[in-house]
A protein has these predicted regions:
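Active-site cofactor/cluster-binding pocket
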Residues: 1-186
Length: 186
């Protein structure tokens, strides 16, 4: 089982991103479970989403406190202790950050670090927004940086959740994220 914890701010699409990733996993014959957690302040407040992926049914229904991977959707969150809390040694971190992966220090020995300027990509694809839509560029980055989900498996769930022109723009953002991510092993 792969246990993933998303960290973002309300409005960035962490919950939707985890849902799309879960649907893509399901389309590949895997099992998926998504559990969002957020406070009363939605837009702009901290959002955490727990996502499990497995080849067999998932029975565990708790939060994820020792993740195999963290997905950090807002660059301001990378220094927060709750982001690295419980992250397994040798785990994966995928961050919305302009820094090179080798410059990232979460205080735990990681097996894989990936960075992408998802905020910049969001601005290029969607235009300037008060809260940039970074979930789909991050999904592209996740696809390339890991073997969890194939890039082509993300298109249909994106179209399903975000129909029409918005879906097409998000597919473009996802593909751009796949192309732009930088990955460092060990």
């Amino acid at each position: 089982m792969i246990e993933i914890r998303f960290h973002g701010m309300g409005g960035q699409g962490a919950v939707m991103g985890a849902l799309i990733l879960a649907e893509a996993a399901f389309s590949e014959g895997k099992y998926a479970q998504k559990i969002p957690m957020y406070g009363g302040a939605r837009r702009g407040g901290d959002v955490t989403v727990f996502l499990r992926l497995d080849d067999k049914p998932i029975r565990r229904t708790s939060g994820i406190y020792e993740p195999d991977a963290v997905i950090v959707m807002d660059p301001t969150l990378k220094k927060q202790p709750f982001v690295r809390a419980g992250l397994k040694e040798g785990g994966t971190a995928i961050l919305n950050d302009e820094a090179e992966p080798k410059e990232v220090d979460l205080g735990v020995e990681l097996g894989r670090v990936a960075t992408i300027d998802a905020t910049g990509l969001s601005t290029e694809v969607f235009g300037q927004r008060a809260i940039p839509i970074v979930n789909t560029p991050m999904l592209g980055a996740i696809s390339k940086a890991t073997s969890w989900i194939k890039l082509e498996s993300l298109s249909e769930p994106i179209k399903h959740q975000l129909p029409g022109r918005l879906g097409e723009l998000n597919i473009k953002a996802c593909q751009r994220g796949y192309e732009a991510v930088r990955v460092t092993e060990g």
